[in-house]
A protein has these predicted regions:
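Positively charged, amphipathic and often flexible ligand-engagement surfaces
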Residues: 1-304
Length: 304
């Protein structure tokens, strides 16, 4: 089911149907702050009031023309302006295929460079999300080259990939900030652990490499076992709560989000917004069978 949903998340036919459907729009709102930047700002304000920080993500991926890539970049510049105007405790997450990675690395690198330079004026930070494994090497190349000019950019490492440990070690050598997650795409067993238990074990292994590195990393998960392992390891190694942050997605396990803050941990909430929510929404359905059941039930009209 997970593979099927992830496969469908790339469907160019299903996307417009789902995006027009009022029920899927309503269910998607559980995971997406709204259609526009005002909605994201309102969500970030709420998150900040709850003593959490935010990362704003303008949804969109795999643009097919240069004009769209340039428009996305302009939007990201405006997001940093707005974060500063509103005095939000927030940074930005973005995807390279939204900035033209499918059209060529040079265009994408130029646009990321502009965004990171703009963010640096506000002493703010850009997180480059990690997409499917076909993009990993190119993403790392762009991040490393842009980071050589401005240090306020980091990326994401996915525990399900066999190659991640080596990539993590290389990023640590240059001092790069990393968000550790399990990985959300459909990957073959030639590149990724097929078993969840192996992904979880690798997640813990990687967390134990990241935390003592002296670099500020994000431990992104809703999994109580991963949270517990991180807390225990930090305690054992006397790693201060200010030296890393937990990260979770908007609308997911808000009970755990509040609990972490109560316990004195730093928590950043990833806030996606925009009209292009279909692939993001499908990945969230794929992560949890109960989400799919809820969605399918919502589609069936209730008898009065
Ligand atoms: P796991 O999937 O084992 O879930 C543990 C528990 O969390 C579940 O039992 C359930 O209670 C809850 N949960 C998890 N997903 C849920 C959902 N969709 N709905 C409801 N409950 C859910 N991936 C990627 O490939 N590239 C990236 O750049 C990012 N970026 C990113 C940022 C942040 C802040 C987070 C938290 C996650 C990502 N991800 C990501 C997604 C990540 O790879 C992964 O798919 C999800 O976080 C789910 O994995 P968990 O670690 O939560 O564990």
């Amino acid at each position: 089911m997970r593979s099927l949903l992830l496969h469908l998340s790339e469907s160019k036919r299903l996307a417009p149907l789902m995006m027009k459907n009022p029920v899927s729009r309503r269910v998607a709102r559980r995971f997406v702050a709204g259609d526009n930047l005002d909605d994201a700002v309102a969500a970030a304000r709420g998150v900040n009031q709850a003593r959490q920080t935010a990362s704003l993500d303008m949804l969109g991926e795999n643009v097919t023309d240069e004009a769209s890539a340039r428009r996305s970049a302009e939007n990201y510049l405006a997001i940093f302006d707005r974060i500063a105007q509103e005095r939000l405790e927030a940074n930005v997450s973005l995807k390279l295929t939204q900035l033209g990675l499918d059209l060529g690395t040079a265009l994408c690198e130029e646009l990321v460079g502009k965004i990171v330079t703009h963010a640096a004026r506000y002493s703010n930070f850009v997180r480059v999300d990690m997409e499917g494994s076909a993009y990993t090497e190119r993403t790392l190349g762009v991040v490393k080259r842009v980071r050589a000019q401005h240090e306020n950019v980091g990326t994401v490492m996915q525990a399900y990939l066999y190659h991640t440990e080596q990539d993590v070690r290389e990023l640590l050598e240059i001092g790069c900030r990393i968000r550790l997650c399990k990985g959300a795409y459909n990957e073959p067993p030639t590149v990724a652990f097929p078993q969840k238990s192996d992904v979880d074990a690798n997640y813990v292994k990687l967390m134990k490499i990241l935390l003592p590195s002296g670099i500020y990393h994000g431990i992104a998960t809703h999994d109580p076992a991963m949270l517990q392992a991180t807390k225990e390891f930090a305690r054992e190694k006397q790693i201060d709560r200010e030296q890393f942050e937990f990260q979770m997605l908007y609308g997911i396990r808000t009970d755990l989000q509040k609990q972490l803050v109560r316990e004195g941990y730093r928590l950043r909430v990833y806030i996606p917004y925009g009209t292009d929510w279909f692939p993001y929404f499908m990945r969230r359905l794929a992560e949890r069978p109960a989400n799919l059941t809820f969605f399918l039930r919502s589609l069936v009209p209730r008898r009065s």
